[in-house]
From Swiss-Prot:
The record marks Y84 as: Interaction with target DNA. This is Endonuclease V. Its cofactor is Mg(2+). DNA repair enzyme involved in the repair of deaminated bases. Selectively cleaves double-stranded DNA at the second phosphodiester bond 3' to a deoxyinosine leaving behind the intact lesion on the nicked DNA. GO terms for cellular component: cytoplasm. The keyword Transmembrane helix does not apply. Belongs to the endonuclease V family. It is found in: Cytoplasm. Its main location: cytoplasm. The gene is nfi. Keywords: Cytoplasm, DNA damage, DNA repair, Endonuclease, Hydrolase, Magnesium, Metal-binding, Nuclease. Pfam families: Endonuclease_5 (PF04493). InterPro entries: Endonuclease-V. One of its GO terms (molecular function) is single-stranded RNA binding.
Length: 229
């Protein structure tokens, strides 16, 4: 497991963090199709915290996009690098997530984040931030709609409805399993929204949550127990 320290110059205040978001947000690419769903590699990233010790563990799990078999995995443990502030959660996680990605023995391909991309109050959530820093195609698949509104999509798998900030579509509520509550998909970087939804459906053949996130969540929880034992 890779050990990470807070990088020199990392934002220490909300004002500094928002300035970084403002600087990087203009680099997000929204209109590329990204890799075809079900091809190449796709990587899930997730984190787990021990708040008493200020420890965060990140996991990156690479799957074969066609079979959803695990190809590679890596973890990293670090100090929590920013206070808990809604809208700025990426600053708590990104140094450790980047270290986990760097520790992989193969290129990650498309990255799927358990969270948000442009479906974010400042249109720059974790998936967008990670995509801009790495240059890799990224999407966000979240379990709840955050502060945004939506109409419930139809009951069948694959039904979708716009996730709205006022009149602007910032993502989609997507039904990944018939009769089960939707997930909330948004563009991160270099993958448009239609393809982000197609990737999400390809990653959810049996369960509501993408297989990438399920595997990364399980691994980071195990790694946190090991790191804090």
């Amino acid at each position: 497991m890779t050990t990470v320290r807070i990088p020199a110059g990392w934002p220490a205040t909300e004002e500094e963090a928002r300035a970084v978001q403002d600087e990087l947000r203009g680099r997000v690419i929204l209109d590329e199709p990204g890799p075809p769903p079900g091809t190449g590699r796709v990587t899930g990233v997730d984190v787990a915290y021990d708040d008493e010790r200020d420890v965060v563990v990140a996991a990156a799990v690479v799957l074969d996009a066609a079979t959803l078999d695990v190809v590679a995995e890596a973890t990293a443990v670090g100090e929590v690098s920013f206070p808990y502030v809604p809208g700025l959660l990426a600053f708590r996680e990104i140094p450790t997530v980047l270290a986990a990605l760097d520790a992989l023995p193969c290129p990650p391909g498309l990255i799927v984040c358990d969270g948000y991309g442009v479906a974010h109050p400042r249109r720059f959530g974790l998936a967008s931030h990670l995509g801009v820093l790495t240059g890799l195609p990224t999407i966000g698949v979240a379990k709840n709609p955050f502060t945004f509104s939506y109409e419930d999509p139809g009951a069948p798998r694959g039904s979708a409805a716009p996730l709205l900030a006022g009149a602007d579509e910032v993502g989609r509520a997507l039904r990944t399993q018939s009769g089960v509550k939707p997930v909330f998909v948004s563009v991160g970087h270099r993958v448009d929204l239609d393809h982000a939804c197609a990737h999400t459906l390809a990653l959810t053949p049996k369960y509501r949550i993408p297989e990438t996130t399920r595997r990364a969540d399980s691994l980071c929880r195990r790694a946190l127990k090991e790191a804090t034992a």
